[in-house]
Curated annotation (Swiss-Prot):
Principal location listed in the UniProt entry: cytoplasm
GO biological process: DNA recombination; DNA repair
Official protein name in the record: Holliday junction branch migration complex subunit RuvA
Stretches for region Domain II: 65-143
Gene transcribed to yield this protein: ruvA
SUPFAM superfamilies per UniProt: DNA helicase RuvA subunit, C-terminal domain, Nucleic acid-binding proteins, RuvA domain 2-like
Residue span of region Domain III: 148-197
Molecular-function annotations in GO: ATP binding; four-way junction DNA binding; four-way junction helicase activity
Entry text on domains: Has three domains with a flexible linker between the domains II and III and assumes an 'L' shape. Domain III is highly mobile and contacts RuvB.
Disulphide connectivity of cysteines: none
Region feature (Flexible linker): 143-147
Organism: Chromobacterium violaceum (strain ATCC 12472 / DSM 30191 / JCM 1249 / CCUG 213 / NBRC 12614 / NCIMB 9131 / NCTC 9757 / MK)
Length: 197
C-alpha cells in the first residue's frame, strides 16, 4: 500500500497531478480542495494517498491531510459511492462541511453534488451519520494571490468538468465570473451558481 508521496510537483491539470519521487512520476487524482493547497510546479509537495487496485489499473488518490483521506475512505464504503463520486463530493465541499451536512441531514446540499441524487444523499446520511468528525482544519484556502488569466479560467472550467458538469454548464457558470477572480474563488462561485439551478 502506498500511504504517502513526497516529491516534486511536476504536472497540475485538475483533477490530476504528477509527483516526481526519485525519478518516478506518480499520477495522482486529487479533490479540488487539495488541488488549491498544492505548491507551484517544481516545488516539493507531500500527499497522503489511497491506492485503489482494480483488475485493469492501480489508481492513486491524494489528499492534503490524513483527515481528508480518512473521509474519502469512509465515502467509498457507502453503497453506490465510488472513488470518482467521492472525489466530486470532496471537491464540492470540505470534509468539515460534509460532516456538518451529514450530521444536519442536509439532503439538498448533498444532492447538489453532480452524480448524487436524493436517494444517494439519503444513503450518505444514513451510512455516515456519526462516522465523520469535524477537525476544523480542512478548509479551502481563500485563493491564489493573483488574478485569473485565460489559463486559470480554463483551470476553473476543467475543475467543473472533473466534477461531472458538462461543457455547456461549465461555460455558463464561468461566463459571469469577474475578470480578477482567483482560481479557487472562481470554482467556488461557479459551483454556487450551478447549485442554485
Amino acid at each position: 500500500m502506498i500511504g504517502r508521496l513526497s516529491g516534486k510537483l511536476i504536472e497540475k491539470l485538475p483533477p490530476q497531478v504528477v509527483v516526481d519521487v526519485n525519478g518516478v512520476g506518480y499520477e495522482v487524482d486529487v479533490p479540488m480542495t487539495t488541488f488549491y493547497q498544492l505548491p507551484a510546479l517544481g516545488q516539493p509537495c507531500t500527499l497522503f494517498t489511497h491506492l485503489a487496485v482494480r483488475e485493469d489499473a492501480h489508481l492513486l488518490y491524494g489528499f492534503a491531510s490524513k483527515e481528508e483521506r480518512q473521509t474519502f475512505r469512509q465515502l467509498i464504503k457507502v453503497t453506490g459511492i465510488g472513488a470518482k463520486i467521492a472525489l466530486a463530493i470532496l471537491s464540492g465541499m470540505t470534509a468539515d462541511e460534509l460532516a456538518i451536512a451529514v450530521a444536519s441531514e442536509d439532503i439538498k446540499r448533498l444532492s447538489a453534488v453532480p452524480g448524487i441524487g436524493k436517494k444517494t444523499a439519503e444513503r450518505l446520511v444514513l451510512e455516515l451519520r456519526g462516522k465523520l468528525a469535524t477537525g476544523g482544519n480542512l478548509t479551502v484556502p481563500g485563493g491564489l494571490p493573483f488574478a485569473a488569466t485565460p489559463d486559470e479560467k480554463s483551470d476553473i472550467v476543467n475543475a467543473l468538468l472533473a466534477l461531472g458538469y458538462n461543457e455547456k454548464e461549465a461555460a455558463a457558470a464561468t461566463k459571469s465570473l469577474p475578470a480578477d477572480v482567483t482560481v479557487s474563488e472562481g470554482v467556488r462561485l461557479a459551483l454556487k451558481s450551478l447549485m442554485k439551478v
